[in-house]
Amino acid sequence: MAVTKKPDLSDPVLRAKLAKGMGHNYYGEPAWPNDLLYMFPVVILGTFALSISLAVLAPAAMGEPANPFATPLEILPEWYFYPVFQILRVVPNKLLGVLCMAAVPVGLITVPFIESINKFQNPFRRPIASTLFLFGTATAVWLGIGAALPIDISLTLGLF
């Protein structure tokens, strides 16, 4: 346990310093103009200097230039778009695929209205919300893993 010395506010010398705005931040030094005019610009300029020095001294590797005439066989999106990409890839009708994607946020919006009867915060006492969460998480993981696989084994994940 740390022992900290608290200031003696009954000391008239300290009270006079505090009234003038003198002293350390712990004793009530005002943020204006000390912090805002002196400390913040130093931190901001230091951050800019560090960023610029890293960009100049250690630039990120760009890799080989892209060839617009040679595209890969299958273009994959970023990893966080895998479940959405898998929905579009599996559903045969594109309009139906877009409607399936739009159904996800609509379904998430309806969950609080379904659970409005239940006032408990414990997830074990909210079976509908817990079941929907587990089902949605499992479905998103399943679709995400399937999107990284070829189309013929994407639904079964190569298990069957």
UniProtKB/Swiss-Prot annotation:
The keyword Transport applies. It is a multi-pass membrane protein. GO terms for biological process: mitochondrial electron transport, ubiquinol to cytochrome c; photosynthetic electron transport chain. The keyword Transmembrane helix applies. It is found in: Plastid, Chloroplast thylakoid membrane. It holds the Pfam family Cytochrom_B_C. Keywords: Chloroplast, Electron transport, Membrane, Photosynthesis, Plastid, Thylakoid, Transmembrane, Transmembrane helix, Transport. The 4 large subunits of the cytochrome b6-f complex are cytochrome b6, subunit IV (17 kDa polypeptide, petD), cytochrome f and the Rieske protein, while the 4 small subunits are petG, petL, petM and petN. The complex functions as a dimer. This is Cytochrome b6-f complex subunit 4. It comes from Oltmannsiellopsis viridis (Marine flagellate).
